């Protein structure tokens, strides 16, 4: 059982493709893609054993490992940060202009790099939690919001709002890769062959999606409709384009689908320096090497 960390969308296109095209079946795997609910998130499902593989962001995974939940990364899709700060007001032109302002942040986490940035810049920001959409931002109830370039920012643009100044965390020295596939260390130790096959078939799914984006989008929309997710094809197409772009490193190199030791060290040092973890998590730890 595989659980992506959110509701069906193009963020997970490669896995839907691998399922629909029979890539998992070809390597002898019978995969069920089971999305989590708000009351039972992906990590809970992994810990209780109802899911065997989940997607997580690198920062989340490092925090969980530090908390005593041994996780192993078996595939890394994201190679750069999608995080951005999007101002609602025209008078926010620099980071310092965020001082004393209300800024939206996901209730479920994901915003740690932005919070670390704010602390380092000594910005007094009032973080306002939101669940999943940009309603608070659109209504003007907050002065700015955290967003991903592949989802919330696209929603904002689709509403006809064109922010003049946006802050990409990658441009500010916080380019931390995000989504990867994770399993518990125990499951990794006892199912290495199957997990290697799952990772390879998933990689094939993503490579096929990059080569056939229109057909991949059709597969995504079938998944969306089956789960009655409120979205549309235009938004999902833009999301897919953006997700595929984020699978390349900033230097433009082709997707490697693996974590780099440098990225793990950078993320771990960032969290350690901010006091969000107690111990430095190493590349060997997170990739299941002895």
For the regions a protein language model found, what residue spans apply to each?
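Short, glycine-/small- and polar/acidic-enriched structural segments
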Residues: 1-130, 134-148, 175
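N-terminal hydrophobic or amphipathic helices and topogenic motifs
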Residues: 1-28, 262-290
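Short Gly/Pro-enriched turn/cap motifs at secondary-structure boundaries
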Residues: 6, 172, 258-260
